[in-house]
UniProtKB/Swiss-Prot annotation:
SUPFAM superfamilies: FMN-linked oxidoreductases (SSF51395). This is FMN-dependent alpha-hydroxy acid dehydrogenase qulF. Residues 22-394 form the FMN hydroxy acid dehydrogenase domain. The active site is at residue 289. Gene3D superfamilies: Aldolase class I. Changing residue 289 to A: Blocks the formatin of 2-aminobenzoylacetamide. Belongs to the FMN-dependent alpha-hydroxy acid dehydrogenase family. Keywords: Flavoprotein, FMN, Oxidoreductase. FMN-dependent alpha-hydroxy acid dehydrogenase; part of the gene cluster that mediates the biosynthesis of quinolactacin A2 (QUL A2), a fungal alkaloid that features a quinolone-gamma-lactam hybrid, which is a potential pharmacophore for the treatment of cancer and Alzheimer's disease. The quinolone-gamma-lactam hybrid scaffold is synthesized from the combination of L-isoleucine (L-Ile) and the nonproteinogenic amino acid L-kynurenine, followed by quinolone cyclization, oxidative decarboxylation, and lactam formation. InterPro entries: Aldolase_TIM, Alpha-hydoxy_acid_DH_FMN, FMN-dep_DH, FMN_HAD, FMN_hydac_DH_AS, LMO_FMN. Its EC number is 1.13.12.-. Its cofactor is FMN. A 2-oxocarboxylate binds at residues 48, 154, 189, 292.
Amino acid sequence: MPPVNFGSYQTKIYHDGTNLNRLPAITTNPTLLEKHAREVLSSRAYSYIAGGAGEKSTMEANRLAFRQWKLVPRVMRPMDDQSISVNLFGQEYKSPLIVGPVGVQGLFHRDKETGVAQVCSELDVPYTLSTASSSSIEDVAAANQAGHRWFQLYWVHDEEILLSLLKRAKENGFTVLVVSLDTWTLGWRPTDLDQGYFPFYAGIGNDVGFSDPVFRAKHEKKGGKIEDDIIGAANAWVSELDDRPHTWEQVEFLRKHWQGPIVLKGIQHADDARRALETGCEGLVVSNHGGRQVDGAIGSLDALPDIVDAVGDKMTVMFDSGVRTGADVIKALCLGAKAVLVGRPVIYGLAIGGKEGAKSVIECLLADLWQGMGLAGMRTVADCNRDCMRRISYPGDLKTML
């Protein structure tokens, strides 16, 4: 796969602005994305995407963890054949960046999941569809066309419905199954609680379930048609996902019925990583759900080194939670992640400018990653290692949030 110069996006912005008086559609400044999104979203929608568990201390820890790791640039290194491509599960990708699963994208813009999946295909960036989506599996696959797509599973309790979801995902070209382990029940989220708002109870974000033939048949057998009672159907679907944790032993059921890589998402402790390795799954994501589940927890980046040491190269370790910039991606790679999932920034872009806004955010992240690696003397992802960083705290690092 020939390398892609993602830094050319920076050149394009300067050229368009200088010669054509054409400025970027949305800001390139990651510190302003949330502010601009808040200006266009309803209070309920903004609270849902920007909120976290409790007093948001885990969200803050995610950002503070990044600030406490500093890159140590190297100079005078050849960069003629710079590449940020990676190989994950035998598949070559042009970069280590993956758009992670975020639910109810229709809450933020009418372009929703299908729009983001489309631009991911255009950029050749993997798109991860959430079970909690406002678009169906089939519609997202059609929008993503020949793109790389992964399916994130919220583990439904009814095995017949679960098998139907897996079948639909596989038949529609989703190649990697990402299983969320940390959301079997909701974290305590005051920003949503104060507004008494949970979009799924309003029928928003249930499209994967509502479009499932097995769920529909079971619901109708109980005497109700989904379209005649959206609220009742919403309650039935949510009950399939909530309040009953699964066990490590049950992972075998997924392995039996999914032909492809399985990634366990939500690992924060090295012992859980070792247990994940024992299941035979191919990968894991070091993630605390962006600080939305457990308040008072460690920053996800702080969990990464121990987990990488625990499983070594026996599993593909990936990372999310708190990623805002290209430098953040580099730091996660240096600490051992093979790929990095990003969520909130893409959704802020979607809110501000629809699918083109989401595309701009992804392009900015890729360009920032490319430029940052090159300037730090990292020709390829293989050059990203712990020797490239130092852990140092400065007083200004107490400013944690982007």
